[in-house]
Structures are given as structure tokens and as C-alpha cells.
Amino acid sequence: MSQFSLSQCVSMTAEQQEQSLAEINLRLEMMDAHQRVNWALENLPGEFVLSSSFGIQAAVCLHLVTQEYPDIPVILTDTGYLFPETYQFIDKLTTQLKLNLQVFSAEHSPAWQEARYGKLWEQGVEGIERYNQINKVEPMNRALKNLRAQSWFAGLRRQQSESRSKLPVLAVQRGVFKILPIIDWDNRRVHQYLTKHGLEYHPLWEQGYLSVGDIHTTQKWEPGMSEEQTRFFGLKRECGLHEN
């Protein structure tokens, strides 16, 4: 499929987009992660961006994509409630990989939000969704607009959750193309990549965390829990960034 016809996808319905991208996704499924990144850079429209939560295995996609596009803007939506270890990890990877880090946050500070709304994350699913809209979704939408993004790399993997288990390599979200180069990787493959390239897991990995987000909605893994249950008190998995 040509870049011109890909560009037409943005104005299609979700069903039309899926049908239009079906053939190319079959081809992308046969490629390895490096080939997917290079295919995207050659065939998808710029500007390109890469998003990262700087979670447990974030170094993989950050390294993979920046090896091919060193100066790609790396979007972080900072809620102000990340773990201290996450901020330290961000600083370390930014220096190590020479990242072009672009930080976007909510219009109002965490303290102001708490004064206005209370602790939204303690107000059930509705409160969590409102919190995510304010602190994740709106800043990401603003980032995509300000950076004039047309193609967006992200490090999601099918193994991470049921909600991600059927995601394609290439899709359209928020009016831009979204490509997931390591979507089919399992934990073993992630570990092999990190080891091969001298990269580290998030510091909290060693303390039993499988997934890391905000300090108040992230739980350490306990026997019998799925990875999904360690986030948002098990009420939901996604923060809204990767949902239409």
C-alpha cells in the first residue's frame, strides 16, 4: 500500500481502516521488529514520535526505535505521581540513549487537581477515567498536535493484557498512524534484547513489580495476580492513551 493510500485511512471509519490495513498488517506480522521500524520510517508520513511511560521494559522500544531515528521526539505524559524510581529511570535512559525527551503534563498541578476534585483515583472507575483523561489523554493529544505527529511508535505487547492481545502492528488512532514494533514479543524475547544491548529493567522490577504507572494505582505483584490486576486496583488495565 502506498503512502498516499495510507494517508487516506485517517478519514475512514474504524471498520474501513481495519479492512484497508489488513493486507499490510499481514506483511508486517511476517517482519521482525527492526524491519517494522524501518518499514514505518520509509512508508508512513512524518512527523514521527515515540511515546513511553518509562515502565518496566521501556528501554527495549526506546533503544530499538532511536537506533534508526536518533532524534525522534519521545513523548512522556508526566502525571506528577510517578514513582521516584521512575523519574530516576527517565533521567538515566535519557542520558544513556541521548533521548529527545518531550514532557507534557496536565494544565493544573497535582495539588490543584486534588483541591478541585479530591483524589480521583479513589473514586471508582469513573474517577480513575476522569483522572486519566486529565493527566494522560489530554496531554498526549496536545503532544501529538504540538509535535505535528502523523506516525506514532509505541512499545505495547500482546502478552501484557487481554485488552492488548488482538492489537495489530499498524492502526490509526487519534488521527495518526500507530505502529507497535514489538507487539508480538514475549517476556523472554524482551529479556534477551535487554541483555544483548546492555540495557536495564525499571528499578522496581527487582522488587516484584510487573507493570509500573502512578504510585497510587500500581500494586506489587502477588501470587495469583495477573499483570492486569496490578494496575488501577484491578478495575481496568488501560490508562486511556492506547484506547480509541
From Swiss-Prot:
GO terms for molecular function: phosphoadenylyl-sulfate reductase (thioredoxin) activity. It holds the Pfam family PAPS_reduct. Its EC number is 1.8.4.8. It comes from Photorhabdus laumondii subsp. laumondii (strain DSM 15139 / CIP 105565 / TT01). SUPFAM superfamilies: Adenine nucleotide alpha hydrolases-like (SSF52402). NCBIfam families: cysH, PAPS_reductase, PRK02090.1. One of its GO terms (biological process) is sulfate assimilation, phosphoadenylyl sulfate reduction by phosphoadenylyl-sulfate reductase (thioredoxin). InterPro entries: PAPS/APS_Rdtase, PAPS_reduct_dom, PAPS_reductase_CysH, Rossmann-like_a/b/a_fold. This is Phosphoadenosine 5'-phosphosulfate reductase. Its main location: cytoplasm. Keywords: Cytoplasm, Oxidoreductase. The active site is at C239 (nucleophile). Catalyzes the formation of sulfite from phosphoadenosine 5'-phosphosulfate (PAPS) using thioredoxin as an electron donor. PANTHER family: PHOSPHOADENOSINE PHOSPHOSULFATE REDUCTASE. GO terms for cellular component: cytoplasm. Belongs to the PAPS reductase family. CysH subfamily. Pathway: Sulfur metabolism; hydrogen sulfide biosynthesis; sulfite from sulfate: step 3/3. It is found in: Cytoplasm. It comes from the Bacteria. It catalyses: [thioredoxin]-disulfide + sulfite + adenosine 3',5'-bisphosphate + 2 H(+) = [thioredoxin]-dithiol + 3'-phosphoadenylyl sulfate.
